[in-house]
């Protein structure tokens, strides 16, 4: 484990993230502009794709970070049987959920039950598929629906706020099952689907289109919110949630319904709306994709 990763164990995660939250919403022109300009330069942010390409037009760093894209700059795969990539970013890992376990990195895994904080819900994804997408600070930070879904419930699982960068993913055991996260459960035409919004160091919040800010500043217990009967349906490719700083979204899919797009591997750069998975025909046998070992 390198020095930086070791240091993340010792850092006051909550205090730093609380400070980041306040700074992100600061509208002092010198402070917010310095932050925006620094991130653009350090991470090579492409503002030409943004609905507002003028870096000075954003009232706060958070407004810049959660910026919208120009209409038409991302388009959904036209095949209705294709599951869409939910975000811009890079594939951290993807593949089958073997015996209830989700692959994180070489020698690292965690269970779907640990991730979701719900044994019964996790059972629906045994031998299913997962895809973990990392959103770096340069990326578009809104998460969209892979397919049309009816919101059933959300589960906020409190936890640590480790970095979710590539080094941390390789070196911190069960990282995504330890960090604070919001699991959003949907009913879809092909069965259950969960999108897990994973918090991280300096992430100042997760917002959903139906509930606003969903991750409390100091949550200390698992919180369930039941949305059945509320008729909250979100269309394929529509915005579902957003990160107020870079982090990770994990998609869980049930077994025997989809096959992952064959060109996708760990570290593949991805864009919102491209194919994540293709629906299997009724007479198609499921073949598990290969994972990094």
From Swiss-Prot:
Is synthesized initially as an inactive proenzyme. Formation of the active enzyme involves a self-maturation process in which the active site pyruvoyl group is generated from an internal serine residue via an autocatalytic post-translational modification. Two non-identical subunits are generated from the proenzyme in this reaction, and the pyruvate is formed at the N-terminus of the alpha chain, which is derived from the carboxyl end of the proenzyme. The modification Pyruvic acid (Ser) is found at residue 247. Binds 1 pyruvoyl group covalently per subunit. It catalyses: a 1,2-diacyl-sn-glycero-3-phospho-L-serine + H(+) = a 1,2-diacyl-sn-glycero-3-phosphoethanolamine + CO2. Signal peptide: none annotated. It is a peripheral membrane protein. Its main location: membrane. Heterodimer of a large membrane-associated beta subunit and a small pyruvoyl-containing alpha subunit. This is Phosphatidylserine decarboxylase proenzyme. The gene is psd.
């Amino acid at each position: 484990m390198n020095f930086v990763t070791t240091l993340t164990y010792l850092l006051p995660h909550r205090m730093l993230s609380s400070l980041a939250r306040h700074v992100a919403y600061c509208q002092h022109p010198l402070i917010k502009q310095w932050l925006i300009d620094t991130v653009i330069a350090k991470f090579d942010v492409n503002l030409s794709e943004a609905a507002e390409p003028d870096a000075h037009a954003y009232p706060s760093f958070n407004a810049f970070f959660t910026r919208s894209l120009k209409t038409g700059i991302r388009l959904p795969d036209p095949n209705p049987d294709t599951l869409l990539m939910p975000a811009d970013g890079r594939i951290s890992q993807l593949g089958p959920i073997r015996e209830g376990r989700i692959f994180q990195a070489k020698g690292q895994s965690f269970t779907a039950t640990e991730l979701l904080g719900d044994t019964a819900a996790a059972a629906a994804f045994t031998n299913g598929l997962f895809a973990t997408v990392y959103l770096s600070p340069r990326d578009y930070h809104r998460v969209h629906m892979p397919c049309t879904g009816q919101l059933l419930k959300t589960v906020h699982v409190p936890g640590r706020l480790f970095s979710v960068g590539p080094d941390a993913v390789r070196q911190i055991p069960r990282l995504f099952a330890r960090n604070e996260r919001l699991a959003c459960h949907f009913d879809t035409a092909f069965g259950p689907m969960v999108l897990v919004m994973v918090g991280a160091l300096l992430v100042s919040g997760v917002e959903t289109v139906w509930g606003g800010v969903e991750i409390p500043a100091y949550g200390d217990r698992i919180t369930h919110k039941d949305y059945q009967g509320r008729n909250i349906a979100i269309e394929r490719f529509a915005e579902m949630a957003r990160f107020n700083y870079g982090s990770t979204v994990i998609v869980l899919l049930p077994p025997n319904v989809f096959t992952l797009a064959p060109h996708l591997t760990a570290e593949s750069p991805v864009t919102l709306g491209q194919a994540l998975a293709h629906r299997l025909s009724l007479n198609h046998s499921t073949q598990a994709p290969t994972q990094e070992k």
